[in-house]
A protein has these predicted regions:
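Basic/polar, cationic surfaces and motifs that engage anionic cell-wall
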Residues: 1-19, 86-179
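N-terminal catalytic cores of peptidoglycan-degrading enzymes
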Residues: 1-69, 177
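Structural preference for beta-strand elements that scaffold enzyme active sites
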Residues: 24, 72-74, 125-127
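Short coil-to-beta-strand
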Residues: 67-86
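Acidic glycine-/aspartate-rich tracts in secreted/extracellular proteins
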Residues: 32, 80-82, 131-135
């Protein structure tokens, strides 16, 4: 397994090579620590926003999202050890919360991938694990088994917790329009 740091330009080249082979992007966190990378995801994003790839082929099958791995790229933020979701909808990101640099980097990664793969930055194409899990009855709306990126702070916006997919997709659209 490859495990190396890459730039957005290098990611752009990997995405060009995978064009026509990918139609979904799933966003995760590891529920682990900063600097702890996992081969289940194509891309890991560290606390400083660094992008770590685990493959030279983004079309490689990886086991990141239950029953949703074919023709899909899995991206994770290395964070959220000890995170807890509460019944009232509150969240505690644990001892290793997502950083603003991770969130922004994930948005840039999504923008690059969607541009090079010819994908729209919509909730049908770019989905958090929480959003996918809700569709398959194991997310925050049901068992809360998987709630990755269910909510994220909207920074530099108002700083309030908002649906994580909306935060990342919104930033990705901004990056796509403002390179």
């Amino acid at each position: 397994m490859v495990m190396k740091r890459i730039t957005l330009d290098e990611l752009r080249q990997l995405a060009k090579a995978a064009n026509g082979k990918i139609n979904k992007i799933y966003l995760h966190w590891t529920a682990g620590n900063y600097h702890q990378f996992f081969g289940d995801y194509h891309l890991n994003i560290d606390n400083d926003g660094a992008i770590i790839t685990t493959t030279d082929d983004l079309a490689e099958h990886k086991s990141h999202t239950w029953r949703r791995n074919s023709r899909a790229i899995g991206i994770c933020m290395c964070c959220c050890a000890d995170a807890v979701a509460y019944a009232d909808g509150g969240v505690d990101f644990g001892s290793v919360p997502p950083t603003a640099m991770q969130i922004d980097s994930m948005a840039k990664v999504v923008a690059v991938l969607c541009e090079e793969l010819g994908l729209d930055i919509t909730a049908d194409v770019v989905m958090t694990h929480a959003e996918a899990a809700d569709l398959d009855d194991y997310g925050p709306a049901t068992t809360c088994e998987r709630w990755d990126l269910w909510k994220l702070p909207d920074k530099p916006g108002d700083g309030l917790l908002k649906p994580g997919g909306d935060v990342i997709r919104g930033k990705a659209i901004w990056w796509h329009n403002n390179w």
